[in-house]
Structure formats: structure tokens, C-alpha cells
């Protein structure tokens, strides 16, 4: 799941989209999916912390057995985290971008695929459920995990996916409602999986792009019954789809190998766009009425980013020399990041690159405001950035977070660090006035001590 230059396709993909709808009320106190309610990574909440350390402003921290790069999700007093425990020996994580992370052989030790529920106020584990015990069905990249998909919740149930294993539904008391088995498929170079399911209405959608048989799957969220499944041409990818609701319709936007495809809620193709890189990780999202889609595999010459208007039909592919058309407002073939998703704040689109540089563009025109400015020194970046209170937060794989002003120039305000043994590939979650950071060993709840 990482790239040929290998990093983790993982957490960033690890990922979700669009407001899950249910009897539960979606508020800024909840963070029901990857990158939040609207998948933008932006919170309008106030009172959130911008300073922390391994002790400062740490309300609690809880050790999590096993390994998983999926983000925490939050609803009410519940924090949900997926993990897989290897009863044998797990190879140490190697941070950064590199060759040599392929692991062709499937581990033969027994693993446990688990979903945990933690108490938001204390970090206490309220319940832990094992959905499978056995030998893995696939190999994964050294930097991937068997729990890189982020759960999604509608306030009544939580849905978790373990790629090549299955989709599972639990109520908030930990009782399993249903399961749907996923067949094991080959993935690119044996890197594994990471794309997360998404919710809309009473339907759970899952993109299963692999090297055998790629599909878009729709399940009844209450029963797990398959409603429909459509074949896709794309091969292995790790991008979570996005449910885009606008005045014209609701559609399912999927970013994939060299192409973007959007479907209606019955799986019929609405439009497509060629011109992505060969590996896609970032989840699409909408800001200020435009859809932003990016893919920037580091070994490909094309690192495309598109800003797209709603209402498109047919083939949106740009002709040679074009950077826009009737529905593509602007685009660039050279500016997309690889693992991290982009983020829009107050008319500015920020791009965090894996090697620790940041660029900023006018989100409505694509005009550059600043480009390739360096952040803190240290390891690479896999987690997607997040934003609140006029600030942008970028955390690297060492757990060092650069806090910067979200402005027209790069202004780094300060940096925050976690424990020396923490490895941070997961994108954090925001709930109320709390920031939840997952590392390879634990979950931190960061909150201003005065609150």
C-alpha cells in the first residue's frame, strides 16, 4: 500500500467521505469518518489546542495492541479504532520513502483483527471485538498494516473494513449486527489495502480496487445485503471515495489508477476523467463548491490536481495544452502530493509534500501564493494536514507537528513533539475541543489543560 518508492499509501487512504446520515445528529462534536464530517480535514470548533508534547495538554493516552494506520473516529463519548494483532513477531516499521519494502511472502503467524471502542473522556477501553483470528490472506508492504482502513459511524452503528477480509457492523455496545466477506485479491506488488468504506443514507459503499477484479460495492447498512456491485477498470489503489451532494444530484466520486470516475447512487457512470498518476491515495473532497481531486505518485511524471464544478457528464479529459474546460475550473499536472491529501482554508489550497515541503495556491484559480517551502527537518510526511483556528497542522512520521499560520506566506509558529518511540502515519481526528492523534503504539487525546 505504499509506493514504489514506498511509503504508506495507507493512512491517507485510510480514509472516508461525506456525511453519514442516520438518526444521530452530525455535529462538530463528532468526527464520524476519515478527515471529518465532510472529509476536508477542517474544523470550525474553538478552544482546540495548538501546543502539546508527550505531557503538555495530554488529557489521556491509551496503549493500543497491534498495528493499524486507520484514523480514530468519534461519536458522542465513543472513540473507535481498528487494529490487527500479530501473535508472532512483527517486523519493525521503517519510516520514509524507499525501495525494498515489498514483502511477497504472507506471514504464517496467527493474527487477530480487532475493533476497539474507547471512552472519549478517559481513554479507557470500553470493549474490544475480534472479527477474525487466523493467518492473513495477503502480504502487505513493510510500511502498511492490516488495519489501514478507517471505520465510519452513523451514530447508531460503526462499520469497519479489513481489506481482503470483510466488512463488519457493530452497535455501540459492541454487538455485531452483520458481516460481509471480502475475497482475497492480489494488490500491486503485494502492498495490501487501505481504502475505507463510506456511508450515505442507508447504504454503505466500498471501492475494492486491486489487480484481479476491481469493483464498487453497495451494501444495505442495516443488513449487510449486497444491493449492487459494478466492475471497474482501475487496478490497485488506496483512495477512499467521496459522496458529493450538490443541487444537481448526489454522486460517488472515485479516484483511481490514471482516472477519476463518478457514479450515481445506483452505480451508473456519470462522468470520467483521465490524467491521474498510476497510484492514487488521497480522498477527494469539496470546498467552496469545487471538487478537489489529486494524485501524485512520486515516480510518475504526472502529479495531477483538479478543481471541478458540479453537474458534469461524459468524458472530462483535458486535451493536450488544456488546463481547464467546461467543468474543470483549473488543473495542474505537477503539484499534487503522494500520500497526504490537500486542504483548503479560506480560499487557499495547501499542498503538503511527503518530503516535508509545503506549497499554497489560490483555491479558485490555482495561482501560486508560495511554492515548495520547507518545514521542520526529520522524517517524511504520510498523514494528511488538518486545520482549525486559522492554523494549519502538519505531523511527520516522527510525530513532530509543524503549526503554521494559514496565510499567503509560510509562517511556522512552532513545533510540537510526541514520544521518541512514536511513529505517526495516521491522520488525526478532531472532536469538540479535543485532538486525537494515533501513533503505532497508542492514541493521544490532546486538550487544553485549562478546559
Task: List each language-model region with its residue ranges.
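Noncatalytic, solvent-exposed loop/strand surfaces
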Residues: 21-451
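Bacterial N-terminal signal peptides
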Residues: 6-18
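N-terminal secretory signal peptides that target proteins for export/translocation
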Residues: 1-4
Amino acid at each position: 500500500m505504499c509506493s514504489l518508492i514506498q511509503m504508506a499509501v495507507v493512512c491517507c487512504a485510510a480514509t472516508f467521505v461525506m456525511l453519514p446520515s442516520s438518526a444521530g445528529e452530525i455535529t462538530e462534536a463528532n468526527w464520524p469518518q476519515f478527515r471529518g464530517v465532510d472529509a476536508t480535514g477542517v474544523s470550525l470548533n474553538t478552544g482546540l489546542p495548538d501546543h502539546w508534547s508527550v505531557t503538555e495538554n495530554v488529557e489521556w493516552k491509551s496503549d493500543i495492541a497491534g498495528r493499524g494506520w486507520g484514523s480514530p473516529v468519534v461519536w458522542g463519548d465513543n472513540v473507535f479504532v481498528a487494529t490487527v494483532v500479530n501473535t508472532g513477531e512483527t517486523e519493525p516499521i521503517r519510516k520514509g520513502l524507499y525501495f525494498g519494502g515489498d514483502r511477497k511472502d504472507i506471514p504464517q503467524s496467527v493474527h487477530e483483527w480487532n475493533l476497539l471502542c474507547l471512552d472519549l473522556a478517559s481513554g479507557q477501553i470500553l470493549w474490544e471485538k475480534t472479527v477474525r483470528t487466523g493467518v492473513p490472506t495477503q502480504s502487505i508492504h513493510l510500511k502498511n498494516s492490516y488495519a489501514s482502513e478507517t471505520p465510519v459511524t452513523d451514530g447508531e452503528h460503526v462499520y469497519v473494513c479489513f481489506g481482503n477480509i470483510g466488512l463488519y457492523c457493530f452497535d455501540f455496545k459492541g454487538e455485531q449486527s452483520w458481516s460481509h466477506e471480502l475475497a482475497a485479491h492480489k494488490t500491486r506488488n503485494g502492498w495490501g489495502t487501505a481504502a475505507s468504506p463510506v456511508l450515505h443514507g442507508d447504504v454503505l459503499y466500498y471501492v475494492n480496487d486491486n489487480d484481479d477484479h476491481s469493483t464498487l460495492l453497495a451494501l444495505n447498512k442495516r443488513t449487510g445485503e449486497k444491493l449492487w456491485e459494478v466492475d471497474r477498470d482501475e487496478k490497485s489503489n488506496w483512495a477512499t471515495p467521496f459522496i458529493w451532494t450538490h443541487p444537481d444530484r448526489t454522486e460517488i466520486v472515485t479516484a483511481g489508477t490514471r482516472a477519476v470516475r463518478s457514479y450515481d447512487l445506483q452505480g451508473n457512470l456519470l462522468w470520467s476523467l483521465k490524467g491521474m498518476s498510476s497510484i492514487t491515495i488521497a480522498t477527494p473532497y469539496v470546498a467552496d463548491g469545487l471538487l478537489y481531486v489529486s494524485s501524485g505518485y512520486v515516480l510518475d511524471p504526472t502529479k495531477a490536481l483538479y478543481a471541478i464544478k458540479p453537474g458534469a457528464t461524459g468524458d472530462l479529459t483535458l486535451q493536450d495544452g488544456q488546463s481547464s474546460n467546461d467543468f474543470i475550473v483549473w488543473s495542474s499536472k505537477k503539484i499534487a502530493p503522494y500520500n497526504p491529501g490537500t486542504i483548503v482554508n479560506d480560499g487557499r489550497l495547501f499542498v503538503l509534500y511527503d518530503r516535508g515541503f509545503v506549497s499554497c495556491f489560490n483555491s479558485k484559480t490555482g495561482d501560486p501564493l508560495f511554492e515548495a517551502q520547507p518545514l521542520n527537518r526529520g522524517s517524511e510526511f504520510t498523514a494528511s494536514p488538518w486545520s482549525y483556528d486559522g492554523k494549519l497542522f502538519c505531523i511527520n512520521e516522527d510525530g513532530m507537528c509543524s503549526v503554521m499560520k494559514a496565510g499567503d506566506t509560510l509562517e511556522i509558529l512552532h513545533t510540537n513533539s510526541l514520544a521518541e518511540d512514536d511513529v505517526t502515519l495516521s491522520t488525526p481526528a478532531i472532536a469538540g475541543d479535543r485532538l486525537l492523534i494515533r501513533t503505532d503504539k497508542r492514541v493521544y487525546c490532546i486538550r487544553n489543560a485549562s478546559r
